[in-house]
Amino acid sequence: DSPEKLKAYLSETNTKILGIYTGANYIYTDAFEDEFFRIKKTIENMEKFGIKHLVLGGGAIRANGNVEEDYKILAKNLDRVAQFAKEKGIIASYHPHLGSAVETPEQIDQLFSLTNISFCPDIAHLVAGGGDALELIKKYRQRIEYVHLKDLKGSEFVPLGEGNIPLEEIIRYLKEDGFSGDWLVEIDGYSGDSYYACEASYKFLEQFFKK
C-alpha cells in the first residue's frame, strides 16, 4: 500500500528483493483470466522495484486427478505470463511444488515438453517429489536462471547441510558449468530457531561462495 515507504526501507537497510513467488489456478480457464489480471499487476509492481525474478508455482490437482489436456492449458497460460513478464524485463520461471499438478519427475517432463518457460529448481521439493535433483538440473540446465537452495531431512525442511540432499555436488555442478544466475536460500515451516537456520545455512555456503 505504501511503495515509497518500502523503497525507503530497502534503501536504508541495503536490502534487495530478488524475486516474487505466486501461484494461480492455471487450468481453470474462466478463473485464470482473473488470476492473470492479478499476476500482471504483480509484474507491474515488480518492475517499479527492479525485481528480477517471478517464480510461478502451482496448477490445481483435480479431485479425480489431472488429464493430459490440463498440462496443455497449464503450459499455454504459463507462456502467457512469461511473455508479459519478459516485456517488462522480468524472468518468469516455473517452480515444481509439492501438492500441485507438477511435483514428480514425470509431471515435470510432461510440462516442459509443452512450454519453454524457465525452470526454478527448488532442490528439496524436487527430491520430496521423488526426483533426483541433480539429474533434473542437468536435464533442464539451459532453462535455469534462478535456484532455490533448500535441504531436506526425512519430511522436514532443515538448514543447508543438515539434511540428506547432496547439495555440495549440486552447487559444484552449477558453478563448474558456468551458472551465473541467482541463488535463494529458504526453509519452509522449519520448527527450529530462524536465526540459527540462517546462520547455519550461511556458514554452509561460505565454502562455495566468496564474500
What do these predicted ranges mean?
Residues 2-14:
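Aromatic-lined substrate-binding rim segments of carbohydrate-active enzymes
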Residues 12, 26-119, 128, 195:
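Active-site acidic/histidine proton-transfer and metal-coordination neighborhood
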Residues 17-22, 54-56, 92-94, 119-122, ...:
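Hydrophobic faces of well-ordered beta-strands that scaffold small-molecule active sites
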Residues 22-27, 59-61, 97-99, 122-126, ...:
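Active-site beta-loop-alpha junctions enriched in small/polar residues
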